[in-house]
Structure formats: structure tokens, C-alpha cells
Amino acid sequence: MESRYLQKCLGTCLTQGLTEVARVRPLDPIEYLAFWLYKHKENMNMEQMRQREMITLEHERELAMMEQEMLERLKAEELLFQQQLAFQLELEMQQKEKQKSEDFETGQEKSFKSMMSMESTARGEEQEPMQAEELVMDSGKTLAEISDRYGAPNLSRVEELDEPMLSDNGVSAPP
């Protein structure tokens, strides 16, 4: 038979089997061809299983790579988030420190101003003690009423009564 005819009509499997029978020349060519066809079919099934397995492995590898990439992205995002959080905390700490220093400076300025006003008040009281008393008397208000400070006592005015003046010379002890 012609090889082109066999390839065209019978297919490659039977053509290869007949070629193998012609090459080996067994005693029972039909039995040899039958075993060869079984073996060929088994080899084809194994090849298909291997290809399916390779496709499955490739798919699993792609899934693993995608999962690995996602984990890397999540780690990168987490690192970025931690850096942003650390930066934000650092900014807050700097703002708190700045606020504390500003509060401290304003406190110092206020205490300095109050000390200066106390000194000037003390100087003013030394020079004009009577004028301050006259201002308090004229206004009719107590020092607590004049003062706007929180916690200053709110006491009512008490009028002093004229009491007889006793001197040490005028009073003598009985003998």
C-alpha cells in the first residue's frame, strides 16, 4: 500500500502502527498491531493528562503570583499607611510642643506684665496711698467688687463705728 493513501484514509495512528509492523516484522502482525494501538492509546491518554496537569499547574501558578502581588501591594499600602500615621503623629507632637512653647511664652509675658504692673502699682501706692483709698471710698464698692478675678471673695461692706479711744496712760490697774 501506498503511504500517502494510508495517511489520508486511515490516519496517522494506524499509519504509524503499520509502519512499526513493517519495520519489526513480528510473527503475528495483527496481534502486534493491536498491542501497539493499545499502547499508543495509553500514551495519548497520558499525554492529555500531562497537558491538563500542566494547564492546571500553570493556572495555579498564575493564581499564586496574583496572590503574591496582592500581598505585596497590601504590605506596601500598610507600610504607606504606617508612614502617614507616624508623620501625622509627629506633626501633632510638633504642634503640641509649639503650642506648649507658645503658652509658656505667653504665660511668661503675662507674669512679666503682672509683675511690672504690681511694681508700678506698688510705686504708685507709695506715692499716692491716699488717692487709692479715696478712689475705693468714692466708688462705694469693695476691692472684691472692683476685682474681676475668679475666686475673689465677695464680701459686703462693714461700717466702722466710733469707739472711745483709750490710751495706755489713762488706764491704770488697781493696786
Swiss-Prot record:
| Tagged with keyword Cytoplasm | yes
Instruction: Name the InterPro entries for this protein.
Output: Dpy-30_motif (IPR007858), DYDC-like_DD (IPR049630), Sdc1/DPY30 (IPR037856)
Enumerate the subcellular locations listed in this protein's record, separating them with semicolons.
Cytoplasm, Cytoskeleton, Flagellum axoneme
Q: Is Glycosyltransferase included in the keywords of this UniProt record?
A: no
Quote the biased-composition stretches of kind Basic and acidic residues, using this chain's numbering: 94-112
Chain segments carrying region Disordered: 94-134, 152-175
GO terms for biological process? epithelial cilium movement involved in extracellular fluid movement; flagellated sperm motility; mating
**Classification via Gene3D superfamilies:** cAMP-dependent protein kinase regulatory subunit, dimerization-anchoring domain
Q: Which UniProt keywords apply?
A: Cell projection, Cilium, Cytoplasm, Cytoskeleton, Flagellum
- Tree of life domain: Eukaryota
Assigned GO CC terms? 9+2 motile cilium; extracellular region; radial spoke; Set1C/COMPASS complex; sperm flagellum
* PANTHER family linked to this entry: DPY30 DOMAIN-CONTAINING PROTEIN 1, DPY30-RELATED
Function (record text) = Functions as part of axonemal radial spoke complexes that play an important part in the motility of sperm and cilia. Plays a crucial role during acrosome biogenesis.
Assembly and partners are described as: Component of the axonemal radial spoke complex 1 (RS1), at least composed of spoke head proteins RSPH1, RSPH3, RSPH9 and the cilia-specific component RSPH4A or sperm-specific component RSPH6A, spoke stalk proteins RSPH14, DNAJB13, DYDC1, ROPN1L and NME5, and the anchor protein IQUB. Interacts with SH3GL3.
Report the family membership: Belongs to the dpy-30 family.
Q: What is this protein called?
A: DPY30 domain-containing protein 1
Gene that produces this protein = Dydc1
